[in-house]
C-alpha cells in the first residue's frame, strides 16, 4: 500500500473541502489513489463533485481572435503577472493568436509557423523574447473553431486589452440568418460559457468514462441510504439528469435568463435571426488551467540568500 503523506492529505483537503481525518481515511481506503479518494469522500457525502480537480496557478494571457466565420484562441504563459502586463508580451500574444488562426489552431504548425512581421518561427520569436524580457515564457496550447455559414463569436473575461485576458471563449453558430444578430447571440452564449465552464455542447458528446464514473459514485452514494434497488435506480437517473444540467451547455440554465436553458434560448432566437441555428461547438481556455505552480518557501529563500 502506498504511504499516505501529509502533503497528500493536504492536497485532498484543498480539492474537496473535507476534514483532515476524513481525507486521511479516504486515502487509506483507496491505497493513496487521489481520484478514487475524491470519489470515496463523495459517496460518504463528505465532498462535493468537482468538474476538474487540481489547483490552478500560472501567469500569462489568453489571446482570442475572430474574423466572422472562424476564430482562434491561445494560451501563452509567463512566470509573473508583471510580465503579462508588459506591452511587448501583450503584442506577442495577440500576434500568436492571429498566427493560430492562419493554421486553424494546429499547435505544432503554430510554433513552427513564421511569426507575423518576422522571418523567425513563433517558437524562435518566443525564445528571443525570453532573453529580451528576462523571464521564461511559452506557448502552451491553441485551438480554432470555424463554420461554413454562420458566425464565430468571441468573449474575453477579465480583459486587460482587447482580445487578451484571463479567460477566453469561442463559440460557433451555424445559420443562414442575420449575421449581426447571430454574433450578438453568440457573444451572450460565450459569456455564459465563461461563467459556467460546461464540459460538452450536448450530452451525446460527453466523455462516456466521465459519465460512468459519475454514475458509479451516485450509485454508491444512493446505496448508503439503504433504500430498495428500484428506488435507488430512480434516484440515480434523476441525479444523472441533474449532472447533465450542470455540465452540458445546451442543458444548462442560461445565465442571461435562468428561466430558459441555453437550448431554449437558441431556439427562441431563431425568429429574430430569421433561420434555424445550430451550436456547432465551443472552446474555453482559462489561464493556468490544470497547471500547478511550484510553491516556494519565502523564509527559506531569504535564509539561503543571507548565508550566501
From Swiss-Prot:
It comes from Parvibaculum lavamentivorans (strain DS-1 / DSM 13023 / NCIMB 13966). It is found in: Cytoplasm. SUPFAM superfamilies: Elongation factor Ts (EF-Ts), dimerisation domain, UBA-like. Residues 80-83 are annotated as: Involved in Mg(2+) ion dislocation from EF-Tu. Associates with the EF-Tu.GDP complex and induces the exchange of GDP to GTP. It remains bound to the aminoacyl-tRNA.EF-Tu.GTP complex up to the GTP hydrolysis stage on the ribosome. It comes from the Bacteria. Belongs to the EF-Ts family. The keyword Magnesium does not apply. The gene is tsf. Keywords: Cytoplasm, Elongation factor, Protein biosynthesis. The keyword Cytoplasm applies. InterPro entries: EF-Ts_dimer_sf, Transl_elong_EFTs/EF1B, Transl_elong_EFTs/EF1B_dimer, Transl_elong_Ts_CS, UBA-like_sf. This is Elongation factor Ts. Its main location: cytoplasm. One of its GO terms (cellular component) is cytoplasm. GO terms for molecular function: translation elongation factor activity.
Amino acid at each position: 500500500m502506498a504511504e499516505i503523506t501529509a502533503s497528500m492529505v493536504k492536497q485532498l483537503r484543498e480539492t474537496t473541502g473535507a476534514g483532515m481525518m476524513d481525507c486521511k481515511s479516504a486515502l487509506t481506503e483507496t491505497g493513496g489513489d487521489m481520484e478514487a479518494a475524491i470519489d470515496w469522500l463523495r459517496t460518504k457525502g463528505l465532498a462535493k463533485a468537482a468538474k476538474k480537480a487540481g489547483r490552478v496557478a500560472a501567469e500569462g494571457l489568453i489571446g482570442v481572435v475572430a474574423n466572422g466565420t472562424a476564430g482562434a484562441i491561445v494560451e501563452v504563459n509567463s512566470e509573473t503577472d508583471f510580465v503579462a502586463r508588459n506591452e511587448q508580451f501583450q503584442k506577442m500574444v495577440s500576434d500568436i493568436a492571429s498566427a493560430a488562426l492562419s493554421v486553424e489552431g494546429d499547435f505544432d504548425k503554430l510554433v513552427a509557423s513564421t511569426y507575423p512581421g518576422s522571418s523567425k518561427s513563433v517558437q524562435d520569436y518566443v525564445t528571443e523574447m525570453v532573453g529580451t524580457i528576462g523571464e521564461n515564457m511559452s506557448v502552451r496550447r491553441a485551438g480554432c473553431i470555424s463554420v461554413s455559414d454562420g458566425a464565430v463569436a468571441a468573449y474575453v473575461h477579465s480583459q486587460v486589452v482587447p482580445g487578451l485576458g484571463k479567460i477566453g471563449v469561442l463559440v460557433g453558430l451555424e445559420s443562414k440568418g442575420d449575421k449581426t444578430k447571430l454574433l450578438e447571440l453568440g457573444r451572450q452564449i460565450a459569456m455564459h460559457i465563461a461563467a459556467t465552464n460546461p464540459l460538452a455542447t450536448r450530452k451525446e458528446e460527453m466523455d462516456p468514462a466521465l459519465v460512468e464514473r459519475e454514475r458509479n459514485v451516485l450509485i454508491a452514494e444512493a446505496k448508503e441510504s439503504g433504500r430498495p434497488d428500484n428506488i435507488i435506480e430512480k434516484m440515480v437517473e434523476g441525479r444523472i439528469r441533474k449532472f447533465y444540467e450542470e455540465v452540458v451547455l445546451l442543458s444548462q440554465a442560461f445565465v442571461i435568463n435562468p428561466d430558459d436553458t441555453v437550448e431554449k434560448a437558441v431556439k427562441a432566437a431563431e425568429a429574430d435571426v430569421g433561420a434555424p441555428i445550430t451550436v456547432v461547438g465551443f472552446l474555453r481556455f482559462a489561464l493556468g488551467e490544470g497547471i500547478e505552480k511550484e510553491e516556494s518557501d519565502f523564509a527559506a529563500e531569504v535564509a539561503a540568500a543571507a548565508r550566501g
